Amino acid sequence: METAKGSFSLEVMDPDNISGWRDEDPYFGSEKRGKNIILYDWFAMTSKIDSVESLIDKIGFTSDVKFEDTYGFYGYKNRVMFDGMSIHYNHNQKSADYPLIEFTGQGCRDFETYTDGNWWRLFEMALDTENYHVTRLDVAFDDHDGIFDIRNMVMKTLNREYVSKTHKAQIVDSITREVDSWSLQFGVRQSDMYCRVYDKARERGYTDGRHWIRCETVFKDEYALNFIRNKLSLGEKYCGILKNYLRFVEPNKSDSNKRRWKTSKFWDKFLGNCNKVKLYTPKTVDYNLSLSLIHI
């Protein structure tokens, strides 16, 4: 485990040494009790060159893991699955039938538990864009220290006391007989990046009063690839991306421009003075094509 340097008020799991963390219990392991962490929480990638067997081999299991056949998904006819890890495939070899490796949140914990936990083994495959295409990467910050007050964040969102790159925010109020809980979403699911904040303890049904709020960001396609390409530490780039994407602010009645309002203290405590990180890559212009069109 690596403690974030500088102003970061959180602990970051070192992607090369995180074996043993299990997501279903945030208090698993005395050395991790009550720690704020950043972790990978979803990974999906297609391959042009692999079979199911070669993908399983490349995952690099260090203990016996048995994949079981199950029903297909996402238009694939077949799938093998172990806990939260799946490989979707078709028997016929068409260009659109490239096998898809997918880890859910639990699948990411399985990867860290049943291999040496080295995410860069998979990320180096993703960087080979001729043969692989990363379709989704989720990165989550788990707050166990009380940095986030979900009710306060809901109220600030309702009052539009935030500045964001996205034009859409959504508040979901889930009411059951025992509890009610809120979740926030900034951006839409169809976009290449969106952010969710929710009460993970309530979602898991814990009733012992523990504080576990998750801030989860979903990256797709080019955004996922650019996240992997960025050479900053996991904590620096995740916090930097959020700093560029979303900011909660304190209202100032004498200034109508929200962008000049001060950042809320809890958001500053979360992100500190990290530098903003942008994932968007402007499309380059093919000048040869442009010139040829001019002469048509």
Name each model feature, range by range.
Residues 1-287:
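Structured, helix-rich domain cores that form ligand/interaction pockets
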